[in-house]
């Protein structure tokens, strides 16, 4: 299909939000020409996308499906430079993310303080997006006819129930639906963005773009194309200038211009959307001139208010009789053949899950809060106390070692994956040149507010006790835990001798061999009390008592290991142009997502969020996509059923297969 040079609507960026926006608007009126420009490659029927269980591959440093942005050095990370990846493929994060179905809290959207963005306004759009493929007792808050599928996947590792028993013994109650918009403290069997009927990942591009292009001819897809700048004519966004995603000729860049008759929607993501605006002349005039760009609209908030969820991992050894995904991701050919054969036979087995089977959202008890430093206690009172639907931390269990398996010995593992839901820290990103390929000035602000440390330390202690109460537990991976003093009761321990011998087998001559005393095996746990009916009543290892020196070790570990959760947002915030309590540097968009100071230009991606959301952000990205498409439709004069913008269902067997030669 030939690509025209002029469209009615241009959507710049085919990520989770952009794919939704383009697909919906192409189904608003099939006489509208909609263009979708994406920097990454097409994801159509790409096995590295649709096979859920191989998602870690997309996060390797040589990944072709992600771009990696390196920050400035930070004293809050012990001098480290943070690496923040962003998806670089059609579908954006929905093509390569962890597939965790998590909703924000009702107060999250109310806190946007923007007309039309209250949770009561947005709930119909949340329901419109999803097909909830599990039994539930609250159908009034879920959708059952949407293009994106939600299920438990078609496989569950045994670690799920072990984790839930352990968290219950800690006073974290099991909740049937932790994503009900109001529950902020509980544990659940975690749902996934996986289609139960097929075992495939449920990504935004297949759901909205490919399904539409198969059935209608008014949606045009332009991949491997980077947005350089937006061209403004007579106060209106009229066109966009693009370049190839990778420079073909550094001395003579190849530009191409596409025009839009009615609307341009910028959806390049939290990192790239502000950079596009800045190259187009929108931003802080002082910073724009310093970068060699003529200011067009004075909007100091562009690129400010950068937020993320701060993540760290703590891995543990598990007993050899339990199941994990370690042998599969390590490259055991026999295991891989068995797993792939099962999935291709019927869409089930370990490939039909992400291995993240259960997790918690938690708030501290009054006693736990009293033990945290005063700065966080004050922050808690200001931000959390009157919003009981907001969790402070999340952690979940991964059925294997999440990391580079060439760096650890063979064996079986489990990993605790934590993230801070509402950091107080803020960062920024700005262009350094008009060149679209230039490296930006990037300070993500990780941990630059002291109030963020206490809940991170608390969650490490909390999840460690969860691990120690699990039947799977066989010791810490000591290289990936805080370096506690040798004499501390909190120090990490290797596998116990019995487990080492079980892994080694009768012919192994060195299992349990110790070099001096710099590593120690796990102390033998207390025996089971057979008088108890359920194992979650049995405390196998006593709770650890941490002293001040131990806390410093945890803090240092967090500074050295905290990283992005791929959940960044906020750099093109909705808010008053003059600023507000939550948008201190000034809003970039009005409540209808219009960029201040220009006509015909909206932003529709996670960068619009003025404040954080307590969830894995794919849910919010889809919600923003749905909201933006509705706003555009309304602005164009459509009403009633036309705004349903129903997309066709994606069906297998009706599309060409794409090769993997470039991967």
Curated annotation (Swiss-Prot):
Superkingdom in the source lineage: Eukaryota
Name of the coding gene: AOX2
Family: Belongs to the GMC oxidoreductase family.
Active-site annotation: 567
Induction field: Induced by methanol. Subject to strong carbon catabolite repression.
SUPFAM superfamilies (UniProt xref): FAD-linked reductases, C-terminal domain (SSF54373), FAD/NAD(P)-binding domain (SSF51905)
Domain notes per entry: The C-terminal peroxisomal targeting signal (PTS) is essential for the efficient targeting and import of AOX into peroxisomes via the PTS1 pathway.
Name recorded for this polypeptide: Alcohol oxidase 2
A Gene Ontology molecular function term of the record: alcohol oxidase activity
InterPro entries: FAD/NAD-bd_sf, GMC_OxRdtase, GMC_OxRdtase_N, GMC_OxRtase_C
């Amino acid at each position: 299909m030939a690509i025209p040079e002029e469209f009615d609507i241009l959507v710049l960026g085919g990520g989770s939000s952009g794919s939704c926006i383009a697909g919906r608007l192409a189904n608003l009126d099939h006489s509208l020409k909609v263009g979708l420009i994406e920097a990454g490659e097409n994801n159509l029927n790409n096995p590295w996308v649709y096979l859920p269980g191989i998602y870690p591959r997309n996060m390797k440093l040589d990944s072709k499906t992600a771009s990696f942005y390196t920050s400035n050095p930070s004293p809050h990370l012990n001098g480290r430079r943070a690496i923040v990846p962003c998806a670089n493929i059609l579908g954006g994060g929905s093509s390569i993310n962890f597939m965790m179905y998590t909703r924000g809290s009702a107060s999250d959207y109310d806190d946007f303080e923007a007309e039309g963005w209250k949770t009561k306004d947005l709930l119909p759009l949340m329901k419109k997006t999803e097909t909830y493929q599990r039994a539930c007792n609250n159908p009034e808050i879920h959708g059952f006819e949407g293009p994106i599928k939600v299920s438990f996947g078609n496989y569950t590792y045994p670690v799920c129930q072990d984790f839930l028993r352990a968290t219950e013994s800690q006073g974290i109650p099991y909740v049937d639906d932790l994503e009900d918009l109001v529950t902020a403290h509980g544990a659940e069997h975690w749902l996934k963005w996986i289609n139960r009927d097929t075992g495939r990942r449920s990504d935004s591009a297949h759901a909205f773009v490919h399904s539409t292009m198969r059935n209608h001819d008014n949606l045009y897809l332009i991949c491997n194309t980077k947005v350089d700048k937006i061209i403004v004519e007579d106060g209106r966004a009229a066109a966009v200038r693009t370049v190839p995603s990778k420079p073909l000729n550094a001395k003579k860049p190849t530009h191409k211009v596409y025009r839009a008759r009615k609307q341009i929607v910028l959806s390049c993501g939290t990192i790239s959307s502000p950079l596009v605006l800045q190259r187009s002349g929108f931003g802080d005039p002082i910073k724009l001139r310093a970068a060699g760009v003529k200011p067009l609209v004075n909007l100091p908030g562009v690129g400010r208010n950068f937020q993320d969820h701060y993540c760290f991992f703590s891995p543990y050894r598990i007993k050899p009789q339990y199941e994990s995904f370690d042998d599969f991701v390590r490259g055991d050919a026999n295991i891989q053949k068995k797993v792939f054969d099962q999935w291709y036979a019927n869409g089930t087995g370990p490939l039909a899950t992400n291995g993240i089977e259960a997790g918690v959202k938690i708030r501290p008890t009054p006693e736990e809060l009293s033990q945290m430093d005063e700065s966080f206690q004050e922050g808690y009172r200001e931000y959390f106390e009157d919003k009981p639907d907001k969790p402070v931390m999340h952690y979940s269990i991964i059925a294997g070692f999440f990391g580079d398996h060439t760096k650890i010995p063979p064996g079986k593992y489990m990993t605790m994956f934590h993230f801070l839901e509402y950091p107080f820290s803020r960062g920024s990103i700005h262009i350094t040149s008009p060149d679209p390929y230039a490296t930006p000035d990037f300070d993500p602000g990780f941990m630059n507010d002291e109030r963020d440390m206490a809940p991170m330390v608390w969650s490490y202690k909390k999840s460690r006790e969860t691990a120690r109460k699990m039947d799977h537990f066989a010791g810490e991976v000591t290289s990936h835990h805080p370096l506690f003093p040798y004499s501390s009761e909190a120090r990490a321990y290797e596998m116990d001798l019995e487990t080492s011998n079980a892994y080694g087998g009768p012919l192994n001559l060195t299992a349990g061999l110790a070099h001096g005393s710099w590593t120690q095996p796990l102390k033998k746990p207390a025996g089971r009390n057979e008088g108890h009916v359920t194992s979650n009543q049995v405390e196998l290892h006593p709770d650890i008592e941490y002293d001040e020196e131990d806390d410093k070790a945890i803090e240092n570990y967090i500074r050295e290991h905290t990283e992005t959760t791929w959940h960044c947002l906020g750099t093109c915030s909705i808010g008053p142009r003059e600023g507000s309590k939550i948008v201190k540097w000034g809003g970039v968009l009005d409540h209808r997502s219009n960029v201040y100071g220009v006509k015909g230009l909206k932003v529709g991606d996670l960068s619009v969020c003025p404040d954080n959301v307590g969830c894995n952000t794919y849910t919010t990205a889809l919600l923003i996509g749905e909201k933006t498409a509705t706003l555009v439709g309304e602005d164009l004069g459509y009403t009633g059923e036309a705004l349903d913008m129903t997309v066709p269902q994606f069906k297998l067997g009706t599309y060409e297969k794409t090769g993997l030669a470039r991967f």
